[in-house]
Amino acid sequence: VAVDGFTYVKSRGGIDEYTLEANGLQVLLIPETSAPVITFMVTYRVGSRNEVTGTTGATHLLEHLMFKGSVNYNRDKGNSVDQLLARTGAQFNATTYLDRTNYYENLGSDQLAMVVGMEADRMRNLLLRESDRRPEMTVVRNEFERGENSPIQSLIKEIFAAAYVAHPYHHSTIGWRSDIENVSIEKLREFYDTFYWPDNATVTLVGDFQSAEALGLIKQHYGVITRAPRPIPQIYTEEPEQTGPRRVVVKRPGQLGVIAIAHKSPAATHPDFPALAILGSILGDGKNSRLYRELTDKNLSTGVFTGPFALRDPSLHFTFIPLAPG
């Protein structure tokens, strides 16, 4: 489909890629007309890897504040994100990870114009009020505490902290408690103004829609937003070569232990990554896997999981072995 204002990039596996010429926004269209529903998702190429000491957890806290109102969609007008989407019966959420933050809505295809307008507005018109930061900080801190009470999550966090001494994968997405509690609304605004721009984002639309109409709506609402006024900061820090094994011990209340082994592995875009994923399945996916037969079938473990973390930069290939009683 040729639409004025867009550059067609390529099609692969049923996915059509376009670039909005006005500002560099990447658009992925995946038509699927079996039901009158769509999924609209905006992914920002910013995650906890973009944080530094003092702002760890800022990406996640900002994700929470993205639901607290923008200039044209807020509770004072009776059309905040949650109010508007709830009235349409939409399912919606957001997630923050090491490499990215995404916001998505599953809703009827007749609501496409509404959701495009709403997401475009909060890309650059977020209110970001201190009165919203304080209660959301408490919510995020509670998430942090739940993670601290999870043996597996605590173990993963400590392994990443030991595996990465230079690269920002060193700290978890949730951040450190003191940063969560003390990061200012001004610092969050600075983070928002640095990374939340169309040339640092991808819009993905899946479902029942006409491509020309969808691109027209995206151009109408996103095309008025400029590119980032300054270059988006890039992470150039590379983790130095590890010179020996590293070990961590995490102690938590409980009866059973967990052994985890993490090997350095390549980034998700590396040509060897698919082979590592297949290796993980052979070793630990299901009751017929080799580690399951050697450990779980012999009552040495209660299960096993192995596989690589799919990340933008060189990652870790994990093997988790929850120990059986005795």
PLM regions with names:
Residues 3-43:
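Mature N-terminal segment immediately following signal peptide/propeptide cleavage
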Residues 56-70:
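Active-site SXXK
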Residues 137, 152, 185-221:
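Non-catalytic, conformational "gating/processing" segments within enzyme and secreted inhibitor domains
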